[in-house]
From Swiss-Prot:
Keywords: Nucleus. It is found in: Nucleus, Nucleolus. It holds the Pfam family Noc2. Belongs to the NOC2 family. Residues 1-59 are annotated as: Disordered. This is Uncharacterized NOC2 family protein C1B3.09c. Residues 1-16, 25-43 have a biased composition (Basic residues). One of its GO terms (biological process) is ribosomal large subunit biogenesis.
Amino acid sequence: MGKASKATKKFTKNHLKNTIERRKQLARSKKVYGTKNRNSHTKNKLESGTNDNNKNKEDLSKLYSDVTTSNTSHEKDGSEDISVLNVNSKGASLNQVSTQKRRSEKDLLAAIAYCQKLSGTNQADALWKNVEKDLKETLDNVDFDARSKILQDLRLEYAEILLTKFNFEKKGYQNLSSALDTILHIKKFSKFPNGLVTQLCNIFVNHSKAREDIQKAVNHICKIDSSLSVAVFQVFYSPLLDFFKSSPSEVNDFDTLEELQLFLIELLSLNSRFYQKIAFAYLSQLDAHLKRCLKESESSDAYKLIYNWQFTLSLRFWLHVISFLWNDYESISKEISPIAINLTLDCIRLIPTEQYYPLRLHLLKSLVNICRSTRLYIPLSSQFLEMIPFVLRRSSPLSDDKEVMYNFDMYSTLHVPKECLLSKSYRNNVRKEVILLMTEYFAIFSNSIAFPELSAPIIAQLRGLVNESAPGKHVLTFLNKLESTFSFVESRRMNVDFTLNDTSQVEAFEKDLDWRSTPMGKLVSDTT
């Protein structure tokens, strides 16, 4: 291969250095926890005797939704504190004016019209003549700024009434349109409109036709005051966690789940600083649960904090966020991605047994998606290598009844009983998913100048196992394409006259070599 050979070896060594160090640290951590006295009892020991069949539906919403204020509070760059509405000596807030009883829709319209009249907008007398006497006197005696603050509160209260009527009247969508128009006229909030945002969230989840209007309203709230973004996000993130209690196949309204996730991602995209703060905070929460699981390793049920649908789908959501926002906020995503990726790999390594291969495949699928969306190299070969002996191992056939019983859908499964490991159907399902993910993963980097070094371990192990078993058509096809791509890239780099330290030349090489033109790339293109 000439000059590129030594440089390629050096490139591979440096590229995997951080990964090797991370694995050593994880191994040392597990060794420390493993040497503890197994007979001791922890004060916070998880409740024993929990039915293993129900662990995937354990409700951990509070753990995963709570975010420390210090981690997520948005800096205001010197803007005033919006938690309390302060009015000067000549003014008053709406909360200081006759709040003993809730105003009717008619009273609110009259008050809004009178505020606009005092501000110079022409209003018919019939619109404002019924304004409350106390409120009228207050509005007459305050300055323009104080009156504007009262007007915003009146509009907020009016919008909440319209949204309440949305669910109980036939003209619900007409009320929603009026509420949206009112919200868009609000220029500032005296405090976080929790009632309003909660109503918007409930309508978004339960009424698909209203989602576009709800999205406009929420975007407006976050844009006029970015410090409210965290609280708004938390309100909408809560129902998402409710969806995450069960597997995706058990969700009654999958479209709502998808649209809610996309809406939250769009909400994060409104502000780069908000995206950075909220992502760090929630990923830190997930990481804290993993550390708690390791600390409580003496308990046989400690792993249930991590190995459940809520944790898995929450982690996958944040991996999806990184993939989706990479192009818009690349620098921030590069800071966040190592946390999410290392957390995912550590979760996989927590219980790396064959029973939990479905969970591993769920997480690997998200990591492969990041590789595809960002072209970020994540060393996943070892994760695939561990599963290859199992998927190619020969097993004695079980009875037809047991085979049907153990024919799990990988999409709706995180783990399987130990008896299922003998099932041919389970092994076939795992093999299919492993080959599919490996094909996509290696196709992504099939134009990399280091592809031969990347694929060599997989080729060596697969070739040895294939000779000892009946691998099947898909495995042989994958192996042949992998070897062909190995030779293809090696031949293309044979005569290069630069080293891998010359990043501009490396990038030019990989840019000229379209991954779709490689044997592995063509295999993916043909199957999609």
